[in-house]
Amino acid sequence: MKVRPSVKKICPKCKVIRRKGVLRVICENPRHKQRQG
């Protein structure tokens, strides 16, 4: 899980979702998981 000021899709399988007001990126590849900090 990377915590970043701006989250972006890294590959075509990444999805940007909003959970409890927090932007997150979920993906098949665990290295692509991100959260807006």
From Swiss-Prot:
UniProt keyword terms in alphabetical order: Ribonucleoprotein, Ribosomal protein
Listed InterPro entries: Ribosomal_bL36 (IPR000473), Ribosomal_bL36_sp (IPR035977)
Gene field: rpmJ
Family indicated by similarity: Belongs to the bacterial ribosomal protein bL36 family.
Molecular functions (GO terms): structural constituent of ribosome
Protein name in the entry: Large ribosomal subunit protein bL36
Residues annotated as signal peptide: none
Protein's organism: Desulfovibrio desulfuricans (strain ATCC 27774 / DSM 6949 / MB)
Cellular component, GO, one term: ribosome
One GO term (biological process): translation
